[in-house]
Amino acid sequence: MVNQTHEFLLEMTGVSKEFPGVKALDKVNLNVRPHSIHALMGENGAGKSTLLKCLFGIYEKNEGNILFLGKEVNFTSSKEALESGVSMVHQELNQVKQCSVMDNIWLGRYPKKGFFVDHDKMYRDTKAIFAELDIDIDPKVKVATLSVSQMQMVEIAKAFSYDAKIVIMDEPTSSLTEKEVSHLFTIINKLKEKGCGVVYISHKMEEIFAICDEITILRDGQWVDTRPLKGLDMDQIIAMMVGRELTHRFPEKTNTPKDVILEVENLTALNQPSIQDVSFELKAGEILGVAGLVGSRRTDIVETIFGVRERSEGHIRLHGREMKNRDAHEAINNGFALVTEERRSTGIYGNLDITFNALVANVDEYKTKMGLLSDKKMKSDTQWVIDSMRVKTPSHQTHISSLSGGNQQKVIIGRWLLTQPEILMLDEPTRGIDVGAKFEIYQLILELAKKNKGIIIISSEMPELLGITDRILVMSNGRAAGIVNTKETSQNEILELASRYL
């Protein structure tokens, strides 16, 4: 695919970018070889996105040089970059979902037969690319019918159709199952075999070590180092990313759970397939993890407890009192809070400020006798969220979409703490958050446990569950396969339980 005549396919040297009052990039380097997978890492705000926007011409760099295949380039658009052989597979996929797969691949450059589109050639060419990349998708189906994993594969095939030399992948596995991740890695390795340089952006350390050859680390808009991954360990990478040693990935747990406060007995959701006969107890000050494979219905547990999913039978008792929780409003009044998995779609109101996002779950608390909103109390509570959650922001009027993922998540956790819950349920609380911010979220969770909150955490990251929980409930195909003490269990035992009812 790639005619290899250069040591580096892409050379970005001394790239700087300034905005009014802010130096976003300060002499940053990124050099990508052919036949290699190159990790680009750094905390949120380190400059990764700005660097790539300079490459694609979205931002105009103030200093530095960009060489592609040995020639200086200054792309003015993503389209120009793509047509030149530099492609990006975004975290949020940008496809025409009502069109067919092959339409999406060849959009704007359809093969012609006379005045008409040559659909037969388009089909054959798409099938040929899919065969080369080991992609099993019908080119004629609508993109809307595909899974996220399949949509990503279509984007990779599109890059391949442009004879891309550089393929940039931004958090490509954030919504994929383990099996889908494995298939994606197979396809990425095929690109590598054909001479491509793949730039791989991810917060998941395990993936970086599994697939990448080299790593470039940015911190605070500056280039820290570029090294072969061989010989590096996770602690060294984290230290370079955050500028200090994190001697532990998880804060030390010093809290001892107290008496049982929540009893869940034979919980079954109304609309199946979902959870069936799930039972567990939760103590004050306890952190209960929920593990399971994708499709094990972990999220259904907290949604049923919170009243957004109807139950057909079962009991929920808080301090021995039966809780109906027929909807989310009733659950909130009963002392339950839920931080949802999809932060962008169901957690934040991106175009609104921190005040709105912090207070939206508790609006009635701010109404005066006249029916107006108390500005003083709203400001006070917003400031409490910013201070207690350690949110990094210039102002409470800042749009939440401009904050990093970690700071957005802190605002959402603060929002629910304002409702004064006894039971806090967190679904994938650190997804898409960098390693330094994860540590801060873990600290907040442990502090809440010390205040005798009952905490339930759903996570797909096994080290996270083993690092901060007291016990782990393992789900398998909608049923509870077992509950294990975190200190006494292992990853293998959890995986065995997760497969029990498959």
Curated annotation (Swiss-Prot):
Residues spanning the signal sequence: none
Q: Topology relative to the membrane, per the entry?
A: Peripheral membrane protein
Compartments reported by the entry? Cell inner membrane
Gene Ontology cellular component list: plasma membrane
Q: Which residues hold ATP?
A: 42-49
Every ABC transporter domain range:
10-245, 255-502
Q: Which PROSITE patterns would you find in this protein's record?
A: ABC_TRANSPORTER_1 (PS00211), ABC_TRANSPORTER_2 (PS50893), MGLA (PS51260)
Molecular function terms in GO for this entry? ATP binding; ATP hydrolysis activity
Q: What is its EC number?
A: 7.5.2.11
List the InterPro entries: AAA+_ATPase (IPR003593), ABC_carbohydrate_import_ATPase (IPR050107), ABC_transporter-like_ATP-bd (IPR003439), ABC_transporter-like_CS (IPR017871), P-loop_NTPase (IPR027417)
* CDD domains reported for this sequence: ABC_Carb_Monos_I (cd03216), ABC_Carb_Monos_II (cd03215)
Q: Which catalytic reaction applies to this protein?
A: D-galactose(out) + ATP + H2O = D-galactose(in) + ADP + phosphate + H(+); methyl beta-D-galactoside(out) + ATP + H2O = methyl beta-D-galactoside(in) + ADP + phosphate + H(+)
**Keyword set for this entry?**
ATP-binding, Cell inner membrane, Cell membrane, Membrane, Nucleotide-binding, Repeat, Sugar transport, Translocase, Transport
* Annotated function: Part of the ABC transporter complex MglABC involved in galactose/methyl galactoside import. Responsible for energy coupling to the transport system.
Record-stated family: Belongs to the ABC transporter superfamily. Galactose/methyl galactoside importer (TC 3.A.1.2.3) family.
Quaternary structure, per UniProt, is: The complex is composed of one ATP-binding protein (MglA), two transmembrane proteins (MglC) and a solute-binding protein (MglB).
This chain's protein is named Galactose/methyl galactoside import ATP-binding protein MglA
Q: Which gene encodes it?
A: mglA
